[in-house]
Amino acid sequence: KGKIFDPQMGKIDLKNNNVKFIGDPQKRIEEDYLRIIRFIRFKILYNSNVEYTTSQAIRHNLNGIKNISKERILVELFKILDLKNFIDLNDSEHLKELFSLIFPEFGNLKRLERLRKIFNHSQIKRDILLAVLLIDEKNNHEYFAHKYNISNDIKENLNLLSNDLKLIRENKDFFDKDLEKNIYLSNKNH
């Protein structure tokens, strides 16, 4: 067996679920502002603690995210949404606040709590998760789709779900009427 050279004591950090930048967090973030979003992803993935210096460096550099291409941001966002424990974002007010500052379109993070039981048993598809977090009366999903130039498939799914939600809100008897129609058609076919 070879020896592990660990000058940054990373092995200890892994044992203690600490995710942090190597060296000066300020310098690491300034080298690539996408590291802020990656930090959030790893923080959720490993359910780790946030050091004060890291927290301050992130807050100080949030504006740097504007300099990153939307495509790179979207790739990292999708990696975050695909985490099995994404819902744990709500367990940390600090992390939720950072996420909301970077992605203000996701104004419905409270809805994640309703999905906790589903998350415990299976992974929720990304499109559905986007719909839950984005769709509201303000058409946030349309702004998000435009801002990040998402695929047409995701746009269509979000628009379809948004339109269905509008129909449900406008017509309180939506399900009853649909049920009656389906029962009628089912009886007619037999």
Predicted regions and their residues:
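Glycine- and charge-enriched loop/helix tracts that form the active or gating conduit
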Residues: 1-146
